[in-house]
Amino acid sequence: MSSESLFSKISPQSPGQEELVKVLADKKYEVVGLFGPTGSGKSLFSVIYGLDSVITGRYRRFIVTRPIIDVVTGRELTSADLGELYYKIVQSYIEDLVSGFVEWSRVQELVSKGQVVIADTHYLKGRTFDDSVILLDDAQSLPVESAIEVITRLGKNSRLIIAGDPVFQRSIGSRDSASMLRELLLGEENARIVDLGLKDIVRPGARRGIKLLLESKMRSRQLDETEKLVLSSLRVHAPDADVVTVVNLVDLKKTYSITSEHTPDALVVAKEGYQGRVVGRGGERVQSIERDTEMKIRVVELTLDFKPFIRAVHPVSWVYKHVVDVDFAGPNIAVKIESNAYGPFVGQKGVHVRFLDHFFRRILDTGVRCYEVEVEEGRSAKRSRAERK
């Protein structure tokens, strides 16, 4: 089987996946870090690349290491705990990934020849991997020290791929290994980071699962007294509405001296399809809640698009029109903003973006980073005319 025929079977479906493929194909990067949510293609592309590398002879071995976690206790299980079952579990994971791309009998042949090797990170001392591709998957579930141990095992003509989820596969308030490894690799020579986001999740099932994870994070928030007050009023005036959470913004507005009338006192996050039931046919429900609580309320639906959240709470009412993209990049939400609106978006001394950062940390335990992007002159002029109207 040729390299081209195997790797061509998996086509990138998003700009992030296209960048991933380019980075994997560029041998100048000895260490490649792939960070993003479940379903974005990290493991699939990495495993196909590794298999392709040994089949074509570019590398002698493909080493796969992946922690196995007991979902009940949260404890990592080693090959000493599980014996032969440890290797069978990892092989099953590889089999599920490559189904439809390469015959499993071909992979088993590579395993029997020692060209595909499953390794336990706990038992790597004294080993050196020459002429090998090493995949360290699910890095968020490993101690950073274990991941660094893998890096020290890199020998001549070898590459390391580290894949992890720094957002959805960590507990609230924790500092996971994937985030720390990403920071460590950012400044390393011959290392390259590829951040994958929600737009890189192409399977409908995976997108649904990520949305449920987001919803679970929001629903598990501990509400303060103000948020409980709003929720109680919601249950009276909108009993048929499915509300995910309520976010108090009063204290944040005081902290960052936000005086804009556009920013509400509280944000209600409704499950997708239920925003209308919170607001009411003519807005009468949300108006009743505002009278009850003496607060300004705004409502958004929970989808995989965070732009409506920025539109709902940012102090500058029109700035959302200049938001080019909002998605996860590593452990943070990255907001790309047109250069002509970058100043108002950030605010004086960064007060607006610090307000947004605090808001998203409160609702999702995730920070915000903003990036200025240039836009075509024609598009910018068209935008300005539209705003004047």
Positions of PLM-derived features:
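Short, Lys/Arg-enriched, disordered terminal segments
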Residues: 1-6, 385-389
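Conserved helicase motor core of SF1/SF2 NTP-dependent helicases
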Residues: 2-11, 17-21, 26-74, 79-104, ...
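Extended basic-aromatic, gly/pro-enriched interface segments that bind polyanionic ligands
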Residues: 107
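C-terminal structural cap/anchor segments
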Residues: 110-112
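Hydrophobic residues in beta-strands of the RecA-like P-loop NTPase core, especially within AAA+ ATPase
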Residues: 135-137
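Short amphipathic alpha-helical interaction segments
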Residues: 139-142, 348
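RNA-contacting regions in translation and RNA-metabolism proteins
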Residues: 200, 205-389
